[in-house]
Design a protein with these regions (language model features):
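Short, surface-exposed ligand- or partner-binding patches at beta-edge/loop junctions that are enriched
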Residues: 118-138
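Short acidic, flexible loop segments centered on an aromatic residue
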Residues: 73-89
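A structural motif detector for short, solvent-exposed N-terminal "entry" segments of globular domains
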Residues: 2-78, 125-129, 145-158
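Acidic glycine-/aspartate-rich tracts in secreted/extracellular proteins
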Residues: 72-74, 109-112, 139-143
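Local beta-strand/beta-hairpin segments that build beta-sheet-rich folds
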Residues: 90, 143-145
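Intrinsically disordered, low-complexity Pro/Gly/Ser/Thr-rich segments with frequent PxxP/GP/PP motifs
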Residues: 88-121
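Hydrophobic beta-strand signal
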Residues: 67, 84, 105-107
Length: 158
């Protein structure tokens, strides 16, 4: 067998192997393209119906909350982010840093903000007990996550 024949045979084997590898790799890349990533900051729970009587007391309003969770290892600044209900009532986050793998509850009533609890300082309920939608948007007004419950929604987390 001549040297040029051996070189051609090696080249043909390399081309064939490359074609097989690219054929195998293509479906994996194509499948990855359609995959939707989970939000890095998400609405992890909603308690729209405060326990007990709805007497519009501050205690009752603060038992109505939306829990926001940072699923990453890195802190996220929520400054300028918004949490909104279906009627358009909006809470705007101030300079709030949410540590990695931590959560904060956004309560409806009046209170003093802490790392674990934020307060909208409202005098009336925000979330409809029977059907509503909580929408979390980032500081570029892009929807990051949303949860619906009741008519037209499937989420009910009490």
């Amino acid at each position: 067998m001549s040297a040029s024949s051996t070189a051609r045979r090696i080249a043909a084997t390399a081309v064939t192997a490359g074609a097989v590898i690219s054929t195998v790799a293509l479906p994996a890349a194509a499948a990855d393209h359609g995959h939707h990533r989970q939000p890095q900051v998400a609405i992890s729970a909603v308690q729209a119906d405060s326990p007990g009587r709805d007497d519009n007391s501050n205690r009752s309003r603060n038992a109505e909350w939306v829990k926001i969770t940072n699923t990453t290892r890195h802190s996220v600044n929520l400054k300028g982010w918004t949490l909104r209900n279906r009627d358009g009532q909006t809470y705007r986050f101030r300079n709030v840093w949410l540590a990695g793998r931590s959560s904060v509850k956004v309560h409806t009533g009046v209170g003093h903000d802490t790392r674990a609890d934020l307060y909208q300082d409202r005098r009336h309920y925000v979330w409809d007990n029977h059907a509503d939608k909580a929408v979390l948007r980032n500081d570029h007004n892009r929807t990051v996550d949303a949860k619906s419950w009741g008519r037209g929604g499937h989420h009910h987390n009490h």
